[in-house]
Amino acid sequence: MAALIDLVDEYSKALAARDFERAVSLYASDAIVVRYEGVAKGPEEISAFLVNFLSGYDRFDLISVDQIQTSGDTVVWDASHDTDAGALQTTNVFVVNDAGLIIRHIPLPRGYWGHT
């Protein structure tokens, strides 16, 4: 459980710093990110997804992890982020391999709630 929570923390810090290399290093080489827009496969596509996602924000700072639940190789969490567009709530699901690297990621932006 602690390793999954640490992974969420490391991922959040990497995104806030726009450190895409660090963020992508948390994924296995055969990882996928499943989104409504399609599936990103492997490091190059995942990096492009992260760059594209954050390109809409000058600021993407974690305010809080509002809920987190782990079970075996899976972690799901809700978080609030401070962005230049206002407060953004997100839900994410990670499934990890035995090495603790992300093999599946389902990101779900949930909505804006005004400026913080």
Please give the residue ranges for each predicted region.
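Acidic surface patches and DE-rich sequence motifs
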Residues: 35, 83, 97
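Short beta-strand segments that buttress and anchor functional surface loops
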Residues: 75-84
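Short, low-complexity N-terminal intrinsically disordered segments enriched in polar/charged residues
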Residues: 1-26, 116
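Short, surface-exposed coil-to-beta transition loops
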Residues: 62-63, 86-92
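A solvent-exposed, acidic/Ser-Thr-rich amphipathic alpha-helical stretch
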Residues: 20-71
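Short beta-strand edge/turn micro-motifs at domain boundaries
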Residues: 89-116
